[in-house]
Amino acid sequence: MRDYQSFEVRNVSVIGHSGAGKTSVLEAMLYYTKATDRFGKTTEGSSMIDFDTEEIRRGLSVYTTIVPIEWEDSKINFIDTPGYLDFVGEKQGGFSVGDSSLIVVNAKDPLQSGTKLAYKQAVAEKKPTIFFINKLDEEHTSFDASYQALREEFGKSVIPFEVPIVEDGKIVGSVNIIKNKAWYYSPELADKPCPVPESMQEEVALYKDQIAEAVAMGDDELMEKFFSGEEFSDAELKRGVRIGVRNGEICPVYSGSAVNSIGIQRLMDLIISYFPTYSERGMYTATTPNGVKVELLTSETEVLTAQVFKTIVDPFVGRISYVKVLSGVLAADSTVVNANNGKPEKISQIYIVKGKHQTAAGKLFTGDIGALVKLQNTKTNDTLCDKGKLLMADPIVFDTPMYGQAVVPKTKNDEDRLSNGLARLQEEDPTFKVVNNPETKETVIYGIGDQHLDVIVNKLNSKFKAEVVLSDPKITYRETITKTAVGEGRHKKQSGGHGQFGHVFVEFSPNPDEEEMVFAEKVFGGAVPKQYFPAVETGLRECCQKGPLAGYKMVNVKTTLLDGKYHDVDSSEMAFKMAAHLAYKDAMTKARPILLEPIMNVKIRVPDEFTGAVIGDLNKRRGSIMGMTPVDSDQEIDAQVPMANMSRYCVELRSMTTGLGTYTMEMDRYDPVPEPYASRVIEDSKKDKE
């Protein structure tokens, strides 16, 4: 593959619902352009794109893959992204480097949740978008039904540019709306424009009017011409369509069948005709380390900025960093600087990646995508620059992992391998997080969902030889008291020689203003010498680490040393510490201790039609609805819910909302646990200690 510069490169993110055929569309392009000698299939393990063992096992994309296609003396870097929602981190990284979007739609179910999410994301990022309705050669599919569903859901910007010609239930060709010509797939008619079938002329005229109207909306001169009934010239129409597609005002619809290579050539032609090259983007904004915004040309003449959007950590090869050159030229055998941390990086070699294959390259020009190996100080979202010209690209925003599971090694031999594997996988995946909880003594791993963590567990085993077991993480309950009580503690021990003696009276009272135990003293007349006050406080703090009900930490308690006795010879710090323990034990029988549970602030965003179901489910979780705010066609629900009832919420919310609901949560406070839940927690705690 030759070098391509910014005016020859297009970067297209391929997005859509899982199973719509995104990878198959790209496999068909590879095969059609003779980049491969066979049509690869994930399920057979022959795919050039989905080649990882996890992808073969599941039969779907798990990772983002770069698929460069050479077509019409240009290079299209397709970024194949997973459609399954658990792998959204891979999708977000891949989507960020695409300058345009190709949404692949399943003709049998055109409005799947992944299609809606893909379009929503493309609109939010203002990226030119094309729809490809796939699998139209399968039974019970209809182009018209699929197109109408898309137009009704997403608006008048969705317009067909080609319509399939169907004879006896089979797609035999297509009609190009703008050119008003038909093309047939039979060998004798291939690449020969033909008249539009008479039965389709009315339909084609209607679609051409839709295109003309959309073009007119973006140009005052053409609008006047449109409403006066004049037809646009071919040049006016093509120019208007290009502008409309690039502004997001027109979303062309194409169709076909990836597995039978129907419509694939026409789709590549459409992408070349209407999607912008990287240089046509014009400018992009970078930021200096001091926070100053700088406008840069998307050109090879500009200073170098190259952003890492994906990292792979291999136990044998090391770190592989996928980069997009946003400006300037990245050269092999050069030294650059990481603008995010100021550290130098040696660029030993650059690779052009095509699925599972890599080819060495001397340079990577503006707009192009490649891979670097063994960078020492660089991670995903970092920007590589020329020395002395440090500029950072806007960071890619990744979802926060919410689904947590405690992880333990299966055997002692797995401990070191597990620790190493978790550290490496965090470098690789921005949506994977590891938290060591000192209170529960658990290591908790967080991901987007259960399938995400399933992939993590399999990678720990296959890549790092660490077998693990997952379980629900323990909830960090708390205990407190609801009544003021005085406890007496008298520690006396005589065993020959010096004995041990300490005697204290301690008041325990609720103190909602301070989480940690507060210690005070009101001792009069030297009943307890001051030198023993720290020992009493230490003893009380030790006791508060384990509450009387279930052994959870005591909070919101004020302790006051009131009185006591000492012995000139037998008293010691240890004796008074033990006396404090006994006073605590005595007081807890009278202070009415209760169990507290963590309450989470939860912010949920769902389409309107799911609001009722989500609120009903929150009520079942003992949640309180704090408010609702309309956001576009969604509702944002603010709620407070006990943490104990949120352990699998990411999976269950996805099920309730067909994948369209999202949420975030953070700790707010501790509240009393009502019965009978408190008794269950206390009973379970006792069983764990047996």
Range-by-range predicted roles:
Residues 1-690:
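Structural and coupling elements of P-loop NTPases
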